[in-house]
Design a protein with these regions (language model features):
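Carbohydrate-binding surfaces of carbohydrate-active enzymes
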Residues: 1-189, 194-203, 222-223
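Short, charged beta-turn/beta-strand-edge "cap" motif at the junction between a beta-strand
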Residues: 205-209
Length: 225
C-alpha cells in the first residue's frame, strides 16, 4: 500500500500513518504497541519508505509493473534483475531492466510474463551505492504459498550488541526474533523474508547473556501451523 502510494504520488495526495502507537494494551492499526515494541508493520514501513526502492505495483489497468521509487534529490539509475522463483529456489523465468528516476520521481516497466503459479513469487535484485538489495512480491498476497520452517541460525556476541545470522534452505516468511520482555530491546530489523539460499544478519541491542538465553527464532510457518 505504501509503495503503491509512493508510485502514484502525483495523484494520491500522500500517505498518512493514522496511528503510530497504541494508547492502551490492545490490537489496533498502530505500528508500535502499548509497551513501545515495534509491530511487523513498523519494520515493513521502514523498508517501504527507504529513499530508493525497487518493487512491484499494479496500475489503474491492473497491469503489473516493476517500479523504481526515489525520494532523494539525485537522479538514480539501477539495473534490475527480476523474475519468478519457487519457494525452494528454482528460477522459473528471469529478465533484466534498467530504470532511472529523478529525485522525487519514479520509473516503471511492465511485467508481461506469467506470474500466478502456486508456491512461487516474484523477486527483484538491484545494487545502490555498492549495496545489494532484493524485493519479494506475491501477486495474491501469498495465499497460494505453503511455507515451511527450514532455516538455521547462529548467535555471535559483539562489542555492543548480539548478531543473529539466519540462513534459509527454503523460502522463510516473516522470520522473527523475540525474547522475554521483548519490548526492552532494539532490533536492527525483524520479521524478514529470506529466499532459499539467502542469509541475513540481524543485530540486537540492549540485551545481556541472560536475555539471549531466552531468544526464540520463529516465522510465519511456525506461528500458523
Amino acid at each position: 500500500e505504501a509503495e503503491f502510494t509512493r508510485s502514484n504520488k502525483g495523484i494520491s495526495s500522500g500517505f498518512m500513518n493514522w496511528m503510530y502507537s497504541d494508547i492502551w494494551p490492545s490490537a489496533t492499526w498502530a505500528v508500535v504497541d502499548y509497551y513501545c515494541e515495534p509491530k511487523q508493520a513498523y519494520y515493513q514501513m521502514k523498508r517501504s519508505y527507504a529513499p530508493v526502492v525497487v518493487t512491484y505495483v499494479q496500475n489503474e489497468q491492473k497491469q503489473l509493473q516493476l517500479v523504481l521509487l526515489v525520494d532523494g534529490l539525485q537522479t538514480v539509475t539501477v539495473d534490475v534483475n527480476y523474475g519468478m522463483r519457487t519457494l525452494d529456489g528454482k528460477t522459473l523465468w528471469q529478465r533484466t531492466a534498467t530504470l532511472s528516476a529523478e529525485g522525487g520521481g519514479a520509473d516503471t516497466a511492465d511485467v508481461t510474463d506469467e506470474c500466478n503459479a502456486p508456491d512461487s513469487y516474484l523477486f527483484a535484485e538491484y545494487v545502490t551505492d555498492g549495496v545489494k538489495h532484493d524485493t519479494v512480491f506475491s501477486y495474491d498476497m501469498w495465499h497460494t504459498c505453503k511455507f515451511v520452517s527450514d532455516y538455521v541460525y547462529k548467535v555471535d556476541k559483539l562489542t555492543d550488541c548480539y548478531a543473529v545470522t539466519v540462513a534459509a534452505n527454503q523460502f522463510a516468511k516473516g522470520v522473527t526474533l523475540k525474547m522475554t520482555d521483548n519490548y526492552k530491546f532494539t532490533y536492527s530489523d525483524n520479521y524478514v523474508d529470506l529466499q532459499a539460499g539467502e542469509q541475513t544478519t540481524l543485530y540486537i541491542y540492549g540485551a545481556t547473556d541472560d536475555d539471549i538465553a531466552t531468544l526464540e527464532v520463529t516465522d510465519f510457518a511456525k506461528e500458523t501451523a
